């Protein structure tokens, strides 16, 4: 019999004080920010890498595709390692690999070497979601875990926002190799901070289990039989396709659709990211006060989908398009903490790392597929359809969220 957690109990040696919770949330958020920073260290340097290695845009794009494929596959596997050996050691190894990947990229003299660096970065990135969420679930009190998820999401957005600024600034004033060497300092510095505070993020003791059995006495792969787990995977896959379209082509589509300058279109994307961070902050409050996170997700994504379709209609002036991008980011951000609470409720006991690893591999899969799909739309000169399909994918995600909530509540009633 597989049981799920609606509220994972805190271990007795971790008192639920505000200071303890805030410390854990800050440390995990710091690590997650590094992960998202590394999502874009290569993309931010494409302008320099293209002439330096005489590469096509397809070859540059393949570097990112390989990064996310390695990260997605590794993420699913990392969840098993987290549950077997503990989240802290796995998190430390991932951060270390990110630093090594930047150093490897900085010394690359061939496309193959760049590919190796991208693969190392993907391996390092793969551990963060299963490790981060396991630590948050184990070390943060139930009353404040929604705020932990909120900060976790915001820190990721900050990493996304800072990477292009930092990498392009250093590469412009010095060299792209120096930019990568400077980027390597970040994970090694954060690793030192985490090591000095390692007691705060210590894992729960891993119970010995018979071969083929999870720590809780259930089969290691039993959680894969839960429909809610695969609905969560589908939710992340679908929403990540939409996110991939926004990240890769929203600015270009706005230029074509509204006739605005590239600078204003870039500002619209910035508005999306900043508003998303604000939405995550508000979403933490909403999630903490709600007992049905799937409904919060459904409402937020309904609004985001309608706004995306409105943006596609080009019935507002250019400044209105910027505002709509911000509104889409805000509503999508509100859904973030409730989304993570939804997964937490669906996760079987003692399988947190495995569930988050499999579920979040859907995010990397969607981010790998999204740019290919939306790139084809843009090659066909269909900027309006880009936003229409972003809305369609967000609407499709609603069905998976409602399905997860229904399955989780049914399982809870059956257990009762």
Region annotations inferred by a language model:
Residues 9-19, 202-231:
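Juxtamembrane intracellular "pre-TM" segments in multi-pass secondary transporters
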């Amino acid at each position: 019999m597989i049981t799920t957690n609606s509220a994972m109990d805190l271990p007795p040696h971790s008192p639920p004080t505000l200071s303890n919770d805030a410390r854990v949330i800050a440390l995990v958020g710091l690590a997650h920010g590094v992960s998202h920073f590394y999502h874009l260290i290569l993309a931010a340097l494409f302008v320099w890498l293209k002439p330096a290695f005489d590469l096509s845009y397809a070859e540059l794009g393949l570097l990112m595709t390989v990064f996310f494929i390695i990260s997605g596959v590794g993420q699913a596997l990392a969840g098993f390692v987290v549950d077997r050996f503990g989240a802290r050691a796995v998190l430390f190894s991932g951060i270390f690999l990110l630093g090594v990947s930047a150093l490897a990229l900085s010394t690359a003299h061939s496309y193959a070497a760049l590919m190796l660096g991208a693969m190392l970065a993907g391996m390092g990135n793969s551990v963060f979601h299963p490790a981060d969420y396991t630590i948050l679930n184990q070390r943060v009190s139930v009353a404040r875990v929604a705020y932990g998820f909120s900060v976790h999401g915001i820190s990721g957005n900050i990493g996304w926002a800072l990477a292009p600024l930092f990498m392009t600034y250093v590469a412009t004033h010095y060299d792209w190799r120096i930019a990568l060497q400077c980027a390597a300092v970040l994970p090694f510095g954060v690793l030192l901070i985490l090591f000095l505070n390692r007691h705060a993020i210590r894992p729960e003791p891993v119970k010995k289990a018979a071969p083929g059995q999870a720590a809780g006495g259930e089969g290691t792969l039993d959680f894969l039989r839960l429909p809610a787990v695969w609905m969560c995977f589908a939710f992340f896959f679908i929403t990540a396709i939409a996110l991939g379209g926004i990240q890769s082509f929203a600015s270009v589509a706005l230029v074509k659709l509204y006739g605005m300058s590239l600078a204003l279109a870039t500002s619209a994307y910035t508005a999306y990211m900043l508003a998303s961070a604000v939405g995550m902050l508000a979403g933490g409050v909403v999630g903490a006060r709600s007992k049905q996170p799937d409904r919060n997700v459904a409402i937020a994504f309904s609004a985001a989908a309608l706004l995306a379709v409105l943006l596609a209609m080009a019935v507002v002036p250019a400044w209105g398009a910027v505002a709509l991008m911000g509104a889409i980011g805000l509503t999508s951000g509100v859904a973030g903490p409730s989304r993570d609470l939804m997964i937490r409720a669906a996760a079987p006991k003692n399988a947190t790392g495995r569930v988050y690893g499999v579920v979040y591999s859907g995010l990397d899969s969607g981010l790998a597929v999204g740019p290919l799909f939306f790139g084809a739309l843009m090659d066909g000169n269909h900027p309006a359809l880009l936003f229409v399909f972003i809305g369609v994918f967000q609407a499709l995600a609603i069905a998976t969220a409602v399905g997860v909530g229904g399955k989780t509540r049914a399982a809870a009633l059956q257990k009762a």
